[in-house]
């Protein structure tokens, strides 16, 4: 699903509502038939419910948001390590920190190789190009195994020559049947990679349909 529209049309706000970073005033959020949010129901979600709901979504920001003090591999294992610890605690079972970390390292190495960065595991963000940093951000989001991977203008902070390497990774994810929601200004990319397109204006979905309907 691609979300297109001019600046200020509400694209990023919609994405933030989906990821529970903003509180929607109307509507529902369902994932795989599971109701995560209903604005018509009184009360607010607890912090624990918000954390649980956010795990359904991975979010790749336009500005990478990598931790500068950690290398590439550590950027991709930090959140899964914490999640494994919290899950063990919630289930009332012992937490094997070493075993969990080993499994998360193996997963991260596989994902980083998938995005073409298998040789950069020990590098720090400052040693990478913008395109490489964005690919690390994609691998980091995938490490949490979200149901839906969201992108907020994933190429807007990149020089034109670095844009294609990120778009190639996203196309590869599409080929692997990864469910994605992409806010983008790359119209040709949206046309060719999307199964469904939403056009927004003034905070409202003005039009939606398959790419042929929207772009003709």
Give the location of each predicted region.
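ABC ATPase "signature
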Residues: 208-209
């Amino acid at each position: 699903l691609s979300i297109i529209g001019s600046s200020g049309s509400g694209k990023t706000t919609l994405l933030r509502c989906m990821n529970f970073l903003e509180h929607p005033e109307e509507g529902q959020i369902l994932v795989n038939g599971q109701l995560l949010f209903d604005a018509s129901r009184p009360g607010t979600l607890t912090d624990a419910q918000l954390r649980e709901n956010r795990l359904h979504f991975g979010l790749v920001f336009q500005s990478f948001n990598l931790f500068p003090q950690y290398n590439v591999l550590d950027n991709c294992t930090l959140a899964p390590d914490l999640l494994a610890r919290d899950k063990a605690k919630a289930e009332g079972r012992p937490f094997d920190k070493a075993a969990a970390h080993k499994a998360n390292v193996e997963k991260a190495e596989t994902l980083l190789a998938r995005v073409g960065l298998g040789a950069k595991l020990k590098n720090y963000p400052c040693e990478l190009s913008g395109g490489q940093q964005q690919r690390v951000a994609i691998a980091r989001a995938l490490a949490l195994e979200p149901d839906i991977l969201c992108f907020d203008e994933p190429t807007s902070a990149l020089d034109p020559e670095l844009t294609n390497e990120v778009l190639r990774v996203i196309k590869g994810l599409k080929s692997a049947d990864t469910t994605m929601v992409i806010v983008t200004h790359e119209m040709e990319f949206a046309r060719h990679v999307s199964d469904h397109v939403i056009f927004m204006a003034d905070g409202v979905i003005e039009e939606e349909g398959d790419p042929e309907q929207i772009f003709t």
